[in-house]
From Swiss-Prot:
S-adenosyl-L-methionine binds at R36, G55, D76, L120. O-methyltransferase that catalyzes the 2 O-methylation steps in the ubiquinone biosynthetic pathway. GO terms for molecular function: 2-polyprenyl-6-hydroxyphenol methylase activity; 3-demethylubiquinol 3-O-methyltransferase activity; polyprenyldihydroxybenzoate methyltransferase activity. The lineage of its organism: Bacteria, Pseudomonadati, Pseudomonadota, Gammaproteobacteria, Pseudomonadales. Belongs to the methyltransferase superfamily. UbiG/COQ3 family. GO terms for biological process: methylation. Its EC number is 2.1.1.222, 2.1.1.64. InterPro entries: SAM-dependent_MTases_sf, UbiG_MeTrfase. Transmembrane segments: none annotated. It comes from Pseudomonas putida (strain GB-1). HAMAP family: UbiG (MF_00472). This is Ubiquinone biosynthesis O-methyltransferase.
């Protein structure tokens, strides 16, 4: 059975044409992207690395990593977001290879081929996150790193990521997230270790609605990222 939620794909297909509009529903992704790329680059030194971006969508992260000197492949199951990504790279001149394929299928085709794998804001949109994590382990080279980001599952995350972001501040369309699919750091850590990945670091991402700025810090109550390593 394919690890794809067609309803989730449809949500992002409908919004795909606005992916690179910095004032659209994707404004938060554009604003947090530099913070996340810097954090990843500081730990993985992207220049010259072969990188896979799982759940690349319209290519915001993929292009940013390519601009840091990485050779990037972006994969997604959404046809419209991939079309937007391919069109945007014609405008930007940034080279990324985009493919419509699941992580699990690519792991069969390209085991141990990537120095770095990123999987950001994707795990909470698939039926079986642990399956994606196992696929990421299989695709990263021994000694390589895998980065995940998702949203914690607790009352504060429900209040801020759903009620606040979708209903009050209207930063995201209603229904973007399903609270039941949010993932606690303990769960993400356990799935990573079960797959063979060693958790090296965790960082939180917070938003101040007064200043309208994001920052990375130790608060992992809502949005967070983890760095994992496949040992040699």
């Amino acid at each position: 059975m394919s690890n794809v939620d067609r309803a989730e794909i449809a949500k992002f297909e409908a919004l795909a044409h606005r992916w690179w509009d910095r004032e659209s529903e994707f404004k938060p992704l554009h604003e947090i992207n530099p913070l996340r790329v810097n954090w990843i680059d500081e730990r993985a030194s992207l220049a010259g690395k072969k990188v896979l971006d799982v759940g690349c969508g319209g290519g915001i992260l993929s292009e940013a990593m390519a601009l840091r000197g990485a050779t990037v492949t972006g994969i997604d199951m959404g046809e419209a977001p991939l079309a937007v990504a391919q069109l945007h790279q014609l405008e930007s001149g940034v080279q990324v290879e985009y493919r419509q394929i699941t992580a699990e299928a690519l792991a069969e085709e390209m085991p141990e081929q990537f120095d770095v794998v990123t999987c950001l804001e994707m795990l909470e949109h698939v039926p079986d996150p642990s399956s994606v994590i196992r696929a990421c382990y299989r695709m990263v080279k021994p000694g390589g790193q895998v980065f995940f980001s998702t949203i914690n599952r607790n009352p504060k995350a429900y209040l801020l990521a759903i009620v606040g972001a979708e209903y009050i501040l209207k930063m995201l369309p209603r229904g973007t997230h399903d609270f039941k699919k949010f993932i606690r750091p303990s769960e993400l850590g356990a799935w990573s270790r079960d797959a063979g990945l060693q958790v090296k670091d965790i960082i939180g991402l917070t938003y101040n609605p007064l200043t309208k700025h994001y920052k990375l810090n130790s608060d992992v109550d809502v949005n967070y990222m983890i760095q994992t390593l496949r040992e040699e």
